[in-house]
């Protein structure tokens, strides 16, 4: 979302006077006279009634009024501005309809970008900004990822508690429209806990697991097991279910669902989607150890009919998690490569061996090229001697 700088030609006193008159004319309980206590008191009074303009008026006109209020707010010293900014942010969350919600969103974005980047008030503005963006269905206009979020607060990082609160909000506003982004937010949230306070993050850890399992685009689930809050769930059903998605095959999930059907459903997880994901994860695991698989093997392992094998493999190839070739004539699947479901010591050793083999092959090629080059030089020299 773009935001233009705030520039108002009138002096502060003139702006305050005009705003007071404007809101009084709309019927607000406010004096048209400037306060003798200073501009901060004027702002408190103006912000207290500013939502009266939501009842009437065009969005463009209201945007101009809010812009004027913002232009005054950004002049208030930091030590006296917190209550004013918080009061304004709260008012902006009360827009009665979508067009005005977008006006309030733009106003908060303008305030956020015109505050000093080292101001701790930017956190509070951004938190309310996300709330309003959700109301307007424009969350991705203000939040595109964790890296972008961190860069915005680089000059004044919020406290761990503040970031936890913000991550929870971001998870809530993205979980219905972007599960992948929501899952990344929850993983980041769990990363803010330490060994000392991980035990109190039980609810966050459960939400993180459920979000990751429900996300159709998240397949590498092994890193979740290393998060401290997730470790505290060992022995719980949700941790058992995560472990199945990390390293077990489809039959293990089917058995778990038969034993704990109510639990799975109570977490908001869809059984058919779980089956689809577990089939893909099972296929990946089979591909790790079997460069060639028959359709018969896949029907047994994936619990599908033989005529469903080809469509299933095609769907797997679309994810780019596995590279393979279908051999319809011989009812086989030839695996070229696959992403590992887990990446532990064995996978690191395999990668080391592969890189070592590449290094040796490159050395052999280099030696061969050197020999060919030397031979060509010798041949050229001998031809010169003959002539």
UniProtKB/Swiss-Prot annotation:
Listed InterPro entries: COPS7/eIF3m, eIF3m, eIF3m_C_helix, PCI_dom, WH_DNA-bd_sf
Q: Which domain of life is it from?
A: Eukaryota
Which Gene Ontology BP annotations are present?
A: formation of cytoplasmic translation initiation complex; Golgi organization; protein secretion; sperm individualization
- Annotated keywords: Cytoplasm, Golgi apparatus, Initiation factor, Protein biosynthesis
Q: What is its main location?
A: cytoplasm
| Chain ranges of the PCI domain | 181-340
Localized where?
A: Cytoplasm; Golgi apparatus
Q: Which family does it belong to?
A: Belongs to the eIF-3 subunit M family.
Which purpose does this protein serve, as stated in its record?
Component of the eukaryotic translation initiation factor 3 (eIF-3) complex, which is involved in protein synthesis of a specialized repertoire of mRNAs and, together with other initiation factors, stimulates binding of mRNA and methionyl-tRNAi to the 40S ribosome. The eIF-3 complex specifically targets and initiates translation of a subset of mRNAs involved in cell proliferation.
Q: How does it assemble?
A: Component of the eukaryotic translation initiation factor 3 (eIF-3) complex. The eIF-3 complex interacts with pix.
Q: What is this protein called in UniProt?
A: Eukaryotic translation initiation factor 3 subunit M
What organism does the UniProt record list as the source?
Drosophila yakuba
Gene name, per UniProt, is Tango7
């Amino acid at each position: 979302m773009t935001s233009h700088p705030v520039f108002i030609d009138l002096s502060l006193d003139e702006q305050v006077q005009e705003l007071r008159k404007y809101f009084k004319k709309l019927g607000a309980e406010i004096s048209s006279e400037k306060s003798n206590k200073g501009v901060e008191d004027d702002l408190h009074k103006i912000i207290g009634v500013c939502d009266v303009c939501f009842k009437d008026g065009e969005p463009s006109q209201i945007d101009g009024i809010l812009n004027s209020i913002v232009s005054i707010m950004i002049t208030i010293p930091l030590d006296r501005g917190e209550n004013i900014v918080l009061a304004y942010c709260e008012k902006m969350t009360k827009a009665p309809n979508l067009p005005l919600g977008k006006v309030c969103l733009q106003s908060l974005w303008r305030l956020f970008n015109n505050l000093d980047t080292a101001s701790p008030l930017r956190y509070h503005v951004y938190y309310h900004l996300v709330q309003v963006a959700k109301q307007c269905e424009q969350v991705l206009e203000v939040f595109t990822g964790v890296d972008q979020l961190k860069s915005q607060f680089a000059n004044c990082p919020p406290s761990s508690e503040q970031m936890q609160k913000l991550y929870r909000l971001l998870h809530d506003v993205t979980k219905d429209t972007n599960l992948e982004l929501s899952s990344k937010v929850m993983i980041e949230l769990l990363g803010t806990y330490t060994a000392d306070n991980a035990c109190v993050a039980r609810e966050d850890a459960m939400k993180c697991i459920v979000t990751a399992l429900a996300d159709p685009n998240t397949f590498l689930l092994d890193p979740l097991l290393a998060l401290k809050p997730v470790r505290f769930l060992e022995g719980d059903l949700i941790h058992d279910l995560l472990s199945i998605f990390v390293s077990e095959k489809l039959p293990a999930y089917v058995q778990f669902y038969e034993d704990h059907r109510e639990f799975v459903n109570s977490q908001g997880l869809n059984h058919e989607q779980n089956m689809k994901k577990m089939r893909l994860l099972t296929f990946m695991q089979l591909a790790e150890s079997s460069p060639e698989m028959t359709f018969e093997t896949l029907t047994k392992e994936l619990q599908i009919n033989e005529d469903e094998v080809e469509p299933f493999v095609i769907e797997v190839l679309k994810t780019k998690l596995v590279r393979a070739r279908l051999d319809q004539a011989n009812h086989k699947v030839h695996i070229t490569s696959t992403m590992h479901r887990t990446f532990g010591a064995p996978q690191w050793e395999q990668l080391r061996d592969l890189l070592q083999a590449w290094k040796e092959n490159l050395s052999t090629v280099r030696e061969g090229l050197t020999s060919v080059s030397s031979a060509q030089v010798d041949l050229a020299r001998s031809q010169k001697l003959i002539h």
